[in-house]
Design a protein with these regions (language model features):
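Leu/Val/Ala/Ile-rich N-terminal alpha-helices, chiefly Sec-type signal peptides and the beginnings
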Residues: 1-47
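Extended hydrophobic/Leu-rich segments
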Residues: 14-16, 27-31, 48-58, 83, ...
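Short, charged, low-complexity loops and linkers
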Residues: 28-43, 75-76, 100-110
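Short, amphipathic alpha-helical "recognition" segments used to contact nucleic acids or chromatin
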Residues: 35-78
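Charged, helical or coil segments that form electrostatic protein-protein
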Residues: 87-126
Length: 126
């Protein structure tokens, strides 16, 4: 399994270990400037919402995240607190699609993981 995300506990931030994940439609959709525009970042270039969503995905779904052995309900609660997502952001269909895609990647039922690995290998050959 490719480790797409990590968590920088020193700075309390999500780290994208494999930027190729943003080539996957469901994750690219989280990353648009329009979607990420907010009061703190009117142009959306800092991707504040996208990073909050990735924090939730990592904390709630990733098998290597802190608390991954906890119950799904507790993981959800902790992920909501850690990410700062609102209920409206959590129920957003684009975000929920990214959550489902990440579960597929975790379960190995998606061809995206091997496809990204192949893409990465080809880049290293160049």
């Amino acid at each position: 399994m490719i480790k797409f995300f990590g968590y920088d506990t020193t700075n309390n931030k999500i780290v994208i270990n494999e930027p190729e994940i943003l080539l996957v439609k469901e994750f690219a959709d989280l990353w648009t400037n329009e979607r990420n525009a907010c009061k703190e970042d009117p142009e959306g270039k800092q991707k504040l919402r996208g990073f909050r969503e990735l924090v939730y995905i990592y904390m709630a779904i990733d098998w290597g995240a802190p608390g991954s052995k906890d119950t799904p309900a507790n993981r959800h609660k902790y992920a909501m607190e850690a990410s700062g997502l609102t209920e409206e952001e959590y129920t957003d269909p684009i975000f929920r699609a990214a959550c489902r895609k990440y579960r597929e990647l975790q379960d190995g039922s998606s061809t995206v993981g091997p496809l990204i690995q192949t893409f990465r290998n080809k880049l290293h050959e160049i």
